[in-house]
Structure formats: structure tokens, C-alpha cells
Amino acid sequence: MKVVNLKQAILQAWKERWSDYQWAINMKKFFPKGATWDILNLAEALLEQAMIGPSPNPLILSYLKYAISSQMVSCSSVLTAISKFDDFSRDLCVQALLDIMDMFCDRLSCHGKAEECIGLCRALLSALHWLLRCTAASAERLQEGLEAGTPAPGEKQLALCLQCLEKTLSSTKNRALLHIAKLEEASSWTAIEHSLLKLGEILANLSNPQLRSQAERCGTLIRSIPSMLSVHSEQLHKTGFPTIHALILLEGTMNLTGEMQPLVEQLMMVKRMQHIPTPLFVLEIWKACFVGLIESPEGTQELKWTAFTYLKIPQVLVKLKKYFHGEKDFTEDVNCAFEFLLKLTPLLDKADQRCNCDCTNFLLQECNKQGLLSEVNFASLVGKRTADRDPQLKSSENANIQPNPGLILRAEPTVTNILKTMDADHSKSPEGLLGVLGHMLSGKSLDLLLAAAAATGKLKSFARKFINLNEFTTHGSGESTKTASVRALLFDISFLMLCHVAQTYGSEVILSESSSGEEVPFFETWMQTCMPEEGKILNPDHPCFRPDSTKVESLVALLNNSSEMKLVQMKWHEACLSISAAILEILNAWENGVLAFESIQKITDNIKGKVCSLAVCAVAWLVAHVRMLGLDEREKSLQMIRQLAGPLYSENTLQFYNERVVIMNSILEHMCADVLQQTATQIKFPSTGVDTMPYWNLLPPKRPIKEVLTDIFAKVLEKGWVDSRSIHILDTLLHMGGVYWFCNNLIKELLKETRKEHTLRAVQLLYSIFCLDMQQVTLVLLGHILPGLLTDSSKWHSLMDPPGTALAKLAVWCALSSYSSHKGQASSRQKKRHREDIEDYVSLFPVEDMQPSKLMRLLSSSDDDANILSSPTDRSMNSSLSASQLHTVNMRDPLNRVLANLFLLISSILGSRTAGPHTQFVQWFMEECVGCLEQDSRGSILQFMPFTTVSELVKVSAMSSPKVVLAITDLSLPLGRQVAAKAIAAL
């Protein structure tokens, strides 16, 4: 008999009662090679014939089972065929189908093309929907049977359905395939969710607890599929997290003016990467704040820390609250953190002793005000702290000294009021404004107000108002002597305040983002061109120091001939710009014997007698001038600086003179610090009793900086946390040695560690140290140091466990942090670096080649192109094609290029025939990437990994899990889903 079609062949086999293997042999004779059985829909044809009657045809079913066992038909074709059966009233047919599914549902596989693997995902999704519908139908029948008094048939079928459902869903591989299918077919997943809800309603009335709990387990497994990548266990066995501690210390010490959002994101990044529970995370923030308060040097730094702790950190926590689901849960976590903090009585007592008050109470009040604590918890915590507090502290508190926390909290609303006052028209009541400014200068008011403004993000606005005021006072027309003196004072106070702000908080705070065409204010011009700063070398012969000669001559005459400075009609900005050239004339006259020392004293008294800003401008030029002089030529210039730095003992000075001189001396001391160290000179500035430059000149003399670096890191590692002083030393070393030197030497120290607990601590500390300039350090680490270690076989031994694991962890943390933040603004402490030692990454990885560099592409292609996937879309896939290219990520960005090249190197290592510690390192690196991911790799560093790396990675035993494959592929792309499906289906 000549067979015409598949249906006839099946019927002939049934009529002639062929055995299953005989059927298979004959089928292969009837249908010669060419079309596959799946294309001919063999599974569907067999099921259709087997399910014609009220009960299934056992012989035809045996053919199907044989076809499944001998892989004549694919799993996906069988699942698709089963899901088309919808007459659930035929018990025996349903049971037969469940038996067939039971044969292979926990060991699905597909070794074909990527499209076939995606087909398996879709078929499994259809089968899951069918199982849910079948379970719901069985449950309804059971209910009807219970009402009729015949529950047995329905109960048996429901048990079989749930058993098959649980077996299918228990496999992580199946759930991973369903995860991909959900992304491929969102509408089908919605149908599954509806079926699950319907099933839940039906089973709610079920009396059998065993079946109900089994159904609940299945429901939980289905609901977990969309979020199967976001489950991370938190570190409950640890109580100290040095990275958070160091990050807070770094921000409080060096970046008070920084925006809050980048800090919030960085803290959340660390919390996620290190899996820190929220209460311990908040506790670590508070601990670091109290340590900062205790160890901060007296004066401005102490006020900065107080503002950081009491004004900025509560606001940071308010922003952090938005990242957590459930506001109530977060307030409970904050309460829990305070409960832990109250157990650290010695720390809190020491802080109270330092600040002369109950520090915790002030903090609790502020958190309560910000809605971070409930009233009940607030009252309970205050009561506990009052009971635990050392009674001697209360008695030793000095009632005459107002504590800094209280002063800072009161200063914050004052800042707002001053900003409003400064908005008024200055010409209407200059005397009233002068009164406000004069009050600001007294005692430590100015530093308090500046710290409060810095911590609340108002300092830039504050500085802008003073620049506008300074600009307003540069000209005077038709003024009386009184008006002229008020104008001179307003100019002087605003100038001194702005200099003080620039030196204390960085010149970035002062600079405006002025659009082209706008006139740059006088103070900004002077600060950028004439003001000495750390790391800024000024040319004393620069045109900015050489103004109009007629103005200079008239100023020299005024200084030399007048008994005191004139005020009326004085253009103070011109005087400030002319003073440098005037000083040069006066110096030359002195050195050539034209002027005697008494005349110089009279001139310097004139310069500083009315407005201190003239003295500041004069010293600014003298500092630049002294740098250029030989050892024997400096004496007179330094003597002139000494003359200008001393106060003037005269009754004929303008208002607030003593207060202005204090600020002037602080400014001059900062200006002269570098040049005095370089010239080994001492100038005694009038002391205020407080070290105005506590973190300056910390490096020990005559010691190689590499020794200093290794020593400081060893001490930090031994202690387990970074203190403020160490942060400043490390920052100086980073400035001095450059990023490559700094990063390379610290990585060498890490690779020397052999104790596991020490390497983990070292990584946590190094990450926080690298935050001094995370972007540049990451470029060096991923672009130079890691490739050097991975490609040089003589260095592979250093990548053994534990230091290798630690380095992989550190590299991933740095990469993730830099990648997540590099689209935002660099922090103020990173922007002010002037560096020539970083290579230009665009020239390192040439930009004309929009793919990653040629060298890396050569490395990544293997001899036998085994990486190339076999479907039509796969064949066209370049071995370096990655999700980042499909997302059209900007490859001109240095970090993107470095990441792309690193992942190509990783791909080549995995595809090479040589295994070693470097291969193990790559595995640890990828494991850490997966461990740190939130939901999927879209937009993370893994988008730079070539798609072909996935098939290489699953060959590594530790990485051959469905969850890992889902994590490392970009499932938002169809190609990413195909790659993931192919890799998972082959596991």
C-alpha cells in the first residue's frame, strides 16, 4: 500500500497492529529524509488519532511515547499538541495526556537552533496554561462530585493535575524557560495570571488540606517566575560594613557641598552589592557620623561634621526611604537601627563629651521631624538614651557653651532668612544689610551659617548672592563719606566671605554656569586668574596682574603719599586688580633703596587699613612672585607678606575691622601654605586658637610615597575602618602619584593578602578608598591593570584564591559604581583634579573603529568558530556582537570602550584551550556580576559582553545554571532571549 499522508500511515499501523519499533522503522521508509517529523506535525497527528474515542487509543499512544523516547519528535511539538486538547470531561484522555507530560516535563531539552529553543519556551508556556485550565476543570468537577456525593473521580484527576504541575514548575530550568516565554508573549502570561486567580477562587473552598497546600505551592512558583532574578540573601551574620562607614566619612570630610542624590545612589549601590540588611545599613551610617563628630578637628571641620550629621544625613535618609517598598517598614528599620545604636553607649558618651550635649537626642528630634521615626518610637528611644547616659556627662556640661548641634539646627532657618534679605534691592538700605553681614562675622557665626548652607545645598545660592552684592559695590557715584564707607565695607565683607567659601568648600561653589555673552563678575574673574589654590600655579607676569599703567601709578601715589586710603568714588575692583602691579613697583623701589622700611610699613598699613581685600589681592600676587624667585631674592617679598598679615593697631579703621582681620588672616594662611612649605619659611599668622588647616601637610618628610601608601593601607586594614586623617593622606597620595600609581600599588597590596577574612575586608576598604576618584580608578583598573594580569602568564599565580576572588569582587564593584554614576555629574572633589597622567582612552581604543579594538577582536575569535550559533540570525552574528551595540551605546565614552574590551578579553579566555587561574578569575568575575545584579542585565555592565560568551560560560560548572544564564543575557532584546533560550535548553 502506498502511503499518501501521515494520517493514513498511522491508521495503517493501527489496523495491522504494528509494534512501536516496527512502526518507527516503517515510518522512516514511508517518509524519506528531508522534512523533519516536527514539520510534518507527527506529534499532533498521533494525538489527534489517539483521542478520537471516549478513551485514548493505547496502541497509537505507545507510538507517541516511542517517538518521544527516541527523539523522533521534539518536546515543544508534543507540548503544543497537548495544549490543543480542551475536552476536560474525558477523564481517561486527560489522564493519558498527563502521563505523557510526566514522561519528560522535568527534563526538557533542545539542542537545535535558537528559534527552536524559543519555540520550546512558547510551547512550555502553552502547556502551563493548559495544565492550569485542566486543574481548574478538575477542581470544579470535584466540587460538583462532593455536592452529588461522588468525589472520587474528580479528586483523583485533580491530584494528578497538581502533581504534574508541581513537577513541571519545580525545575529551575523550566521556570527560566517560562521567564523567557513571558517576555516573548506578554498576552499569554496575562492569560496564565487570570487562570491562576480563577483556580485560587475555586480551590479556596476545597476541604482537602493536602491538595490545597500543593496548589498554593504551585501558585507561589508561578508567581515567582517574573522576579526569579531579584532574590538575594542578606548578610545577617555580619554586623560591621566598613565600606558604608568609609563612604560616609569621605563625604562628611571632603564633600559636604556635594549633591545628595549621587550619595544616595552610591549608598544604595553598596547596600545592593554587599547585600546589607536595612537596619544594619542605617546603623552603619549613624556610627560613621558619630565617629566623624568625635575625631573631627576643632573649628570649621567640627562644624562641617555637625551640619553633615544633623542636616544632610536625615535628608539623605528621607531620599533613601523612596527606594524601599512600604514607608512603615523603613521607619521600623530606622527605629531598629537606633535600638542597635543605643547599645553602643561608649561611642555615644564620647560624642556627648565632645559636643557638650546629648547628641543622640538632637538626632532623634531631627529624624522625628523628618518623619523617619514614629512618635511612639521617638519617645521610647529618648527614654532609653536618657536612662543609659553617663550621669557624669550631665553634670560636666558647660551651660555657658552652646553645643554645636543646637547651633547648626538653628543656623539652618537663618540661612533662608539671610538669602531673602540678600534678594532685596541693595541700594535702598545698605546700612541695614551691613548690620546683617556684620552680625554674620562675629564669633563662629559665619562658619556655622556656611556649614548649614553647604549641608542643605544652599551654598551655591549663598555665594551667588554675595557675588551680586560684590558686583553692586564696585562703583559709587555722587556718594557721601558715610555712603562710601558703607559701600567699602560691603565690598570688603562680600570679597572676604567669597574667598573664605572658595578655600573652605572649593572654588566650584563660586563659579557660575554663565552663558556666552554674559559678563563674568569681577570676583569670579579674580578668583580664576589671580587666587592661589592647592595645585594651581600662577604666573606673576600674567596680563591679569598687569592692568592699565595710569591706574597703577595713581594707586602707588595714593598708597605712598596719603596718610590713609580714600573711600569716596573709589572703584574697589580696579584697586584690587591694580594692587599686584603697584606692589611690584613698591618692591622694586624698596630693593633699589628708593623706599625705606618705614615707608613700606606705611604703605602696607594703608593697604590693610580700610579694606582687607586689598591685602588679600596683594598677597595673592606676592605668593605667585615668591615661587619664581631664587633663595636669596625672597626676603623682601616674604617680609612684605608678614607686614600685610599683621593687624593694624589704629582707631581710624572702618567698622567690624577685628572680625574682618580674623577672616583675612585665615585666607592669607591658606594662600601662603604651599609656598611657605616649598621655601622652608615661617610666617606667624595671628592665632585664633583653632587650627585653620587641620588636614594640611600630613605626609611625613623624607619618606618615599610608596612606603607611606603601603603603611597607611596596612594600618587601615588592621583597624578595619578608614578615619578622616587617613582619607586626607590617601587623597594627597592620589594627587601626588597619579591614578595609575595609586591604583596599581594598592592592588599589589591586595594580591599579597592570603587570609580570606582579610581579603574581604581589604576589598570593602579599597572600594571606599577608590571613591576618592572612582571614575578614573575604574578606567585604570579595568583598562590597564586587569588586562595586564589576565594576559601575562607569569602573573597568573597572583590570581589564585583568596586574593583573586577579592580582586574580581573589587573590579565588579568599581565597574558597576562607575557605570551607574558616569552619566551623572562628577562630584566636586573629583572635578577639581588637574591630571596629566591618565592616558586618553579614545586614543588607547581608537574611535574610528566603532567596534572594540582590533587586538581584542582577534583575541576573541577562535580557530574553529565554535562560538557561532547555528540559526540564520546566529550565523550573521559577529563574535564580538553584544547587547550594547544593539542598544547603540556611545562607544566614544572611555568607560564604555574599556568595558567592551574587558568583556572581549573575558570571552577570549573562556574560548581558549588553556585553562588556569586566569580562567578561574573570569568565573569569579562573572559570578560577582550575577550576584550584584538586581533584575536583569539591561543597562548594566553585562550588556558589553558578547552574546557568544554565554555558550562558553555555561560550560563552566559553577555558571551552568538557568538563573545565571538569565542574569547575564539582555532579555529585553529578541536576540538576547534567543541566546538565553538556546543556552538554557541545552543544559
Swiss-Prot record:
It comes from the Eukaryota. This is Mediator of RNA polymerase II transcription subunit 24. Keywords: Activator, Nucleus, Phosphoprotein, Repeat, Transcription, Transcription regulation. A motif (LXXLL motif 1) lies at residues 128-132. Component of the Mediator complex, which is composed of MED1, MED4, MED6, MED7, MED8, MED9, MED10, MED11, MED12, MED13, MED13L, MED14, MED15, MED16, MED17, MED18, MED19, MED20, MED21, MED22, MED23, MED24, MED25, MED26, MED27, MED29, MED30, MED31, CCNC, CDK8 and CDC2L6/CDK11. The MED12, MED13, CCNC and CDK8 subunits form a distinct module termed the CDK8 module. Mediator containing the CDK8 module is less active than Mediator lacking this module in supporting transcriptional activation. A motif (LXXLL motif 2) lies at residues 344-348. Belongs to the Mediator complex subunit 24 family. GO terms for biological process: positive regulation of transcription elongation by RNA polymerase II; positive regulation of transcription initiation by RNA polymerase II; RNA polymerase II preinitiation complex assembly; somatic stem cell population maintenance; transcription by RNA polymerase II. GO terms for cellular component: core mediator complex; mediator complex; nucleoplasm; nucleus. It holds the Pfam family Med24_N. Expressed in the adrenal gland, brain, epididymis, heart, kidney, liver, ovary, pancreas, prostate, skeletal muscle, small intestine, spleen, stomach, testis and thymus. The keyword Aminoacyl-tRNA synthetase does not apply. It is found in: Nucleus. A motif (LXXLL motif 3) lies at residues 446-450. The modification Phosphoserine is found at residues 860, 871. A motif (LXXLL motif 4) lies at residues 555-559. A motif (LXXLL motif 6) lies at residues 855-859. The keyword Transcription applies. Component of the Mediator complex, a coactivator involved in the regulated transcription of nearly all RNA polymerase II-dependent genes. Mediator functions as a bridge to convey information from gene-specific regulatory proteins to the basal RNA polymerase II transcription machinery. Mediator is recruited to promoters by direct interactions with regulatory proteins and serves as a scaffold for the assembly of a functional preinitiation complex with RNA polymerase II and the general transcription factors. Required for basal and activator-dependent transcription. One of its GO terms (molecular function) is nuclear thyroid hormone receptor binding. Disulfide bonds: none annotated. Its main location: nucleus. A motif (LXXLL motif 5) lies at residues 786-790.
